Amino acid sequence: SSIFSDNQAHYYAGAIRSENSEINLLNCSLSSNRSLTSNGGGAMYLNGGIFSIKSTSFTNNQATFQGGAILISGASGSMEDSNFTGNQNTNSNGGGALLIENSSPSILRCRFIENSTSANNHGGAIKLDTTSASITDSIFIGNRSLTNSAGAIYFDSSSSPSFSNNEFRLNSAAQFGGAFFVNGSNLNLTGDLFLGNYANLGGGIATQGTMSVSLSNVRALGNEANSSSSSSAGFIYLNSGVTSSTFMNSVFSGNKSLGRYGVYRPNGPSRFVNCS
């Protein structure tokens, strides 16, 4: 186990930069590291190669440009049982804790707590770009997109990630999607919990240009669209482009909006099966 604290760089990676190599972190701590100007990765930059991150904590790291804790570009690997707390992206491109591009890692049993982006971009915890990452059994609490969208996770048409059995609690966004904002990609969720998330449009989830939405065994409890009387969709806001939305074996309770659509703002045909 190793400790990396209070390091800084003007370009990539306040603490660790790995280029086309293999890197393994086990029981490590990376805190208060900073990438000061362009490029990003407050604590780490992983460019190509292979990585394994297990039982490691990333706390209060900061990047001016993308990926408050880690910028992953073209690297393959996994993160397990690790904590990301209070990491920030402050100026551009998003991803308060992680920005993942051209890479498809697995994220298992990780915790993302109070990470944020104040950039005019997206993803208080994670921004995904050209990836089919899988995120499973992980917890997202109190992550924020302070000026734009996706309090927890953002992805667009270049990505097709998978999500199962995660918890999203008390995440928030100034604009779209307290937990998720999906721009142009399909959205498939299985067994996820959304509790007390809030935004202007879509307290839990918002989509734009998404064709297919599928939620199975999802619980949506107490999410809110609460910015103003023009807010809409306490839980899920579907904007243009949806051709199919299916909700199966799911529970919607206690969601509300200061404006319209307490639970669901539809677009296109919708199908509900065994929901309450």
Positions of the model-derived regions?
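Right-handed parallel beta-helix
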Residues: 1-8, 22-34, 50-62, 76-88, ...
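Extracellular beta-strand/beta-solenoid scaffold signature
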Residues: 8-17, 34-47, 62-72, 90-100, ...
